[in-house]
């Protein structure tokens, strides 16, 4: 980690993880609790409209930065990097992420206070943001829910992502893996 950052730069260091996920109108079945004698009735729809949430999390503090985009590409990733850079302008940031094409392209403009560090290939279990997506889908009214429009998906996603800002302790418990103590 020390080799990644400029030793002359005296700004404090923050480690973030980044990931993106799709949220849309297509629905699937998920387990749920119902009384023993009853059967769950869940509607289903096959409308393939999606939005993409890009999120960074600092597992040590539970701080997040998120954007919602209609596309998942280099431009959207650039917007997230710019927003994160502005929010933490007085910090050096090491952002750990997967090797998606929009993370590794030369067209991605990386702010001066951010250094990107790729995770090993095929290792989503190392990225704590994956737990955030599971939490949002399970606890923030995406499971077994049908949306009438993409605007309704966006409104629910905005609410869920804004709620995360008030749940830093929960985020720390979900995202601060024991091995992370060694990388700060």
Describe these PLM feature segments.
Residues 1-184:
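Short functional hotspots at interaction and active-site rims
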